[in-house]
């Protein structure tokens, strides 16, 4: 890694090398080398603020489980089968951050773009009277992300509030499918400290991920915790979702042959 500075601009340039090798009994081996460059530019602005740009390229390799051609029975209609022809692929990531702080006020604005051509993602197809679940190097997977964080505090070393709101937009392009999905989310926190007592509250909405044809849902939760500290002793009492009863976590698959939707509730 090389670091340097030109006036208010700091920069870092690095590169790594990754070797991927795998071989299964009775199959040909596969070996792949990839260069993983990364670049960071940090520009200091007037006051306590800056702009930072980061970009990197990394590689991803298939797991041995994904490569195995052994069939596993899922149910009476579906089987799971690996793909020994999977290849490693590259992941491109870039992000831009603006941060500002003055006194007890703080803000952070962040955006990112991810691009993964030939990404290894799930797919299903019909083979006779069975639905085959497998993996393949698909066309590409893309993600656009944005996030804003605002914070106030600590006020008189006792009270602090923060709020984060963001969005993830997924574009999953397979060899036989194409899906888009947008997820809005937020997070809020508040803390209060007085002498030996501390009170903390946190709220998260669902942060969902979409990969291939599968949506993996996050949790919408609230947490309330109270602490008492005396010297090296800390005693706490917490509650999960104390003010709501709408906990929900869901998983979906959007395949045209065998879609499903699972939802977990806590009452």
Model regions and ranges:
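Outer-membrane beta-barrel channels and translocator barrels
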Residues: 6-9, 44-48, 91, 101-105, ...
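Residues on the lipid-exposed face of transmembrane beta-strands in outer-membrane beta-barrel proteins
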Residues: 2-4, 17, 39-43, 86, ...
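Residues that define the transmembrane beta-barrel architecture of outer-membrane proteins
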Residues: 31-35, 90-94, 103, 140-146, ...
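C-terminal beta-signal and adjacent terminal beta-strands/loops
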Residues: 59, 228-267
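Gram-negative outer-membrane beta-barrel transporters
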Residues: 111-120, 132-206
């Amino acid at each position: 890694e090389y670091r340097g500075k030109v006036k208010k601009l700091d920069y870092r340039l690095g590169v790594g090398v990754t070797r991927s090798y795998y071989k299964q009994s009775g199959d040909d081996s596969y070996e792949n080398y990839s260069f993983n460059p990364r670049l960071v530019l940090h520009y200091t602005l007037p006051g306590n603020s800056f702009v930072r740009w980061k970009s990197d390229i990394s590689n991803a390799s298939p797991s041995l489980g994904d490569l195995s051609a052994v069939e596993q029975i899922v149910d009476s209609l579906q089987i799971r089968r690996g793909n020994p022809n999977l290849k490693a692929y590259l992941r491109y990531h870039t992000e831009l951050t603006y941060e500002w702080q003055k006194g007890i006020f703080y803000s952070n604005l962040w955006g990112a773009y991810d691009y993964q051509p030939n990404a290894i993602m799930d797919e299903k197809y019909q083979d006779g009277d069975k639905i085959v679940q497998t993996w393949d190097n698909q066309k590409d997977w893309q993600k656009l992300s944005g996030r804003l964080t605002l914070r106030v505090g600590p006020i008189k070393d006792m009270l602090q509030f923060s709020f984060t709101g963001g969005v993830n937009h997924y574009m999953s392009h397979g060899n036989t499918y194409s899906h888009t999905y947008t997820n809005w989310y937020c997070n809020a926190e508040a803390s209060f400290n007085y002498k030996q007592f501390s009170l903390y509250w946190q709220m998260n909405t669902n942060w969902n991920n979409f990969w291939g044809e599968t949506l993996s849902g996050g949790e919408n939760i609230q947490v309330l915790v109270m602490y008492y500290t005396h010297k090296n002793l800390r005693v706490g009492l917490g509650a999960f979702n104390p003010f709501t009863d709408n906990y929900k976590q869901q998983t979906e698959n959007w395949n045209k042959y065998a879609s499903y939707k699972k939802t977990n509730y806590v009452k």
